A protein has these predicted regions:
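Surface/interface-facing alpha-helical segments and adjacent flexible terminal/loop regions used
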Residues: 1-36, 41-45
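A short glycine-rich, His/Asp/Glu-containing loop-to-beta-strand
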Residues: 36-57, 68-76
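Short loop/turn motifs at secondary-structure junctions and domain boundaries
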Residues: 63-66
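Glycine- and acidic-residue-biased ligand/ion/polar-headgroup-sensing regions
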Residues: 68-70, 74-84, 89, 97-102
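A short hydrophobic beta-strand segment most commonly corresponding to one strand
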Residues: 72, 121-123, 139
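Conserved metal-binding segment of the jelly-roll/cupin
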Residues: 114-135
Length: 139
C-alpha cells in the first residue's frame, strides 16, 4: 500500500511505470468537472473510474480486494476513512465478481484506517484488502 498526496510535489519516478502513469493522470486532470464513468488511460490496462459517492458507516462498507488490477483511490472533495489490512488468504469471500476483478469479504481482522483529504491517493495492491468510502472520524 502507498499513501500520499498529489499536493506533496513528490517525484513519481520511484514508483513502477503503471503507477507513475496513473498518478500523472490524477495530477493533470480536474476530476471535479468530470462526469461519473470510466476513462481509459492506457486502454483496459490502466483506467480511471470516476464516482460521485457518499461515505457510509464502516458496518455498511464491505472490505474488498482485486486479483489483477492495482486500485488507486483518489479523493477529490470531502473527507474519507480508508480501511486496510493484508490479504492473508484466510478471510471468507462473500462475493466474487470476476468481470470487475472485485472480491468482497465477509469480515477482516487487524484492520487499520487512514484519513484521506482532497488530493490524497492510496494505491492498493492485490495483497491488500481495503474498505473505501467510510465516514471520516472528524465531525
Amino acid at each position: 500500500m502507498i499513501f500520499s498526496s498529489i499536493k506533496n510535489g513528490d517525484s513519481f519516478e520511484k514508483y513502477p511505470a503503471a503507477i507513475q502513469t496513473a498518478l500523472e493522470y490524477l495530477k493533470s486532470h480536474d476530476f471535479a468537472s468530470m462526469e461519473p464513468g470510466v476513462y481509459e488511460i492506457q486502454g483496459k490496462d490502466i483506467y480511471a473510474q470516476v464516482f460521485d459517492a457518499m461515505t457510509e458507516d464502516v458496518a455498511d462498507r464491505r472490505p474488498e480486494s482485486h486479483e489483477k488490477y492495482l486500485d488507486v483511490q483518489f479523493l477529490v472533495s470531502g473527507r474519507e476513512r480508508l480501511g486496510f489490512t493484508k490479504n492473508t488468504g484466510n478471510y471468507k469471500v462473500a462475493e466474487y465478481i470476476k468481470e470487475r476483478d472485485l472480491i468482497f469479504y465477509e469480515s477482516v481482522e487487524d484492520e487499520g484506517y487512514i484519513e484521506s483529504r482532497p488530493g490524497c491517493f492510496c494505491v492498493f495492491f492485490p495483497s491488500d484488502i481495503h474498505r473505501p468510502q467510510v465516514i471520516s472520524g472528524e465531525a
